[in-house]
Amino acid sequence: MDTASPEEIDALKRHYLKKELFSLLIADELNFVSEPTNLDHLGSPFVEKGKSVIPYEKSQIPVLRFIFKRFILTFPFLDPDSQNQLWNVNFRNLLKSLSKSNVSVLPDDSDATHLHKWLLKFQNMLTLLMSRAFHSIQDEKNINIELLDTPKLEKDLHKSELQQKPNILEAYVLGVRQSTQAKMLRTKRVYEYLIKVSYEENTFFIARKYSDFSHFHHLLLKSYPNAYVPRLPPKDDHDTYLNSSEDSTLSPLPSRSSDTNDPQSDSQHVLRQERMRIELRQYIKNILNDDELHLTEEVLSFLTDDPVTLTASELTDINFRQELDVIRQLEQQKFVEIASQRAKELDVYMEEFKRSLTENNGFTTLFTELKEKNSISELSPSLQKTIEWARVNLASTIYDTFIGKEKSLETYLQIKKMHQLFPYTVIKNIMRFSNPLSVMKRILDTLLAQPFGMKSLFQRLLSISLNENVRAIHKLISRYEARIVSPEILTKIQEQVENPCKAAREVLEKKQMKRHDYLYFILISDDVPPKLPDNLIRRVYAERTAWKAALDSEDYPTDPTVIRRSKRYGYMMKLMHLYAKQFNKRRSISLISEGATGEIMKSMVDSPELNPNILVEQFIDLVRRHEDSFYDFVHRVYLHDSGLFASLMEWIENIIGFLRQGTSAPIDMDLVVDALDEESRQALDVELNKLLKWNQRKKSALFLRKTTKYIPGEETSLPVTMDELGIDEEIMAELRGDEDDQDENDQVTKVEEEHMEDDDSVEEFDPIIEERQRMKRKANRPANIIPPKPKLRTVKTLLPAFKEQVYPILHKFVSENEKDI
């Protein structure tokens, strides 16, 4: 962007100023309408009894009212005869429930942050709609890839390769062996992970249990409090099963007497702790790639002490797993290459398809062909190629969801639980109906029915993971409550989390306190009931002082009193976080039980175990086997349609037309800033420079994320770009947001939940160490994370002048094009 001309810079500033003002305008209107009593400003059907409809020109939310009337009320699947019940009763009640649930109970409350992200995505979607439809008299320009600092991006992209350490010490977790450990009344099966180590020209093997990894991890955290220690993966007891017929190309596995009682062992080979081995291998790799840790005394001791001699069966097991690693890596690489190659080959046909889609009545023409043709083979060549492209992308998505991603197993287990409850037979019978309205109505009736006042299937499906999470959190709460030994403190923390008093709410709304300061405030403030006795206030003061001292010191504290006090304060912070999570989860369950509606997606479920012989063709064939049946269903539904699909196509084309053509009158952005004095103009210019740099950094982060991470099925991998449909691709990327970013406390809680029943395998939670690590992770945010947005005080002052430009233009457009707004 340094090479851009002054005219281009001005056009960029103008564009992002307009977009920012639209974002502020829509946020202002959304904040107004978040109060259920203000819904009347959306016009009919939001009309309370005894009141008349508020005219459009007197509405406080004209933009939202326009969007609601033009794009939401006109959605074809909504029954015109039940609009009043749907919006004025059901939606109003739902908004009341959501407004109660949209209260943050903690500073940096992770659950409130998740809700805020969804609301922000909705706000960005509306910003996308309006900023593209309202043009400016002056030239505008947005940041594209040519304006990014490409050399710097390439440097960031290959940064990890440049940071590889000399091969002084190498270690690979290659195998797993099983032993037994005697307990008082029973024997326990224990697994040791076999690690091949190369150090100072010597190569040998060591064996380490998961508990050894846990002790080692805790030692690193304590010995190097200012270093970023990679996370130890949670314990995973799952084994991997390979069908005998599918691993014929691999070396034979050794027979094991311990497997004779396994019902699956006759037809399948068992790889014990395979997923855990892979994750621990990555953990060791991350440590050895860290400048501060890779040759420390602790690492050398862990990886070089007590070498072992392996048996023939253990060496055979290692060889088998190594062959599997090679096949797995080649398979994944081949899948990506073939899927990408297929998609590129289809680009030429996709260009033709995109052009036809964006023409007038493009969607109508498309679905008319689906109605007239009885099978895929009868479709036009371009549409057949489009279906082939969709087949490849869907196959990639299936592969990515159930195998390729780190969370694939977790996703599979969640879907499997829902799969066990889902009434496939009932849904199959419903799908026999050809009329789409009948199909949708009967499916909703099935999902939302509450026989004898019991929970509906929809509520049960959504509550599965929430209820399990609440039970796990309750166990953790009991564990930490036992360490505080002060009922008064526990009661006060829980009361202020679940029902903050006025003083606490004011602090939360200002969002100026960190979590440890907020805990101190609610415990000692006289304005926050109930008041603690003086001896407890003195204790809290001493513990908070010790906590700050422990975090501010370079090394881990050595004074036992400081350690005891600071840990207790950390436990109180942990409890406050757990109380908040438990409260938020229960609020979510309550909201579901109140009848909140949503969409449920049913997925085909099969075994998630990694098959070393899976190729891309098998996934594509999986999709191909079902596509004819799916097309036949769509064709028959459309054939018997009574106008619903035609209305849907018209509705979609209405949105695309509005985005492409926009309003008749443009905005004069120079007029918006005319009222500013010279000092304010200079301040505005500084803010716009910051806004421009932030957008450049954000776009660079999105580019890095797109380039370094293979995500099949995302919009970024689709040949159809949003810009070609009149949609801002940058905002679409922003809508996807930081899905990979997780709250640090959530991750710690999740790890603790994994080990609730296995206390011996994990070191005791140390709040001092964890807080240091959290701060270190926050300071070392990767390059592909969107940076915080700069504060824009002067830009906000332009909002009234901007509204004076936008509202009359919108009112004129409404008067010329709309009948009932």
UniProtKB/Swiss-Prot annotation:
Residues 171-310 form the PX domain. GO terms for molecular function: phosphatidylinositol binding. The modification Phosphothreonine is found at residues 260, 597. It holds the Pfam family PX. Keywords: Membrane, Mitochondrion, Phosphoprotein. This is PX domain-containing protein C1450.12. It is found in: Mitochondrion membrane. Residues 235-271, 737-766 are annotated as: Disordered. CDD domains: PX_UP2_fungi.
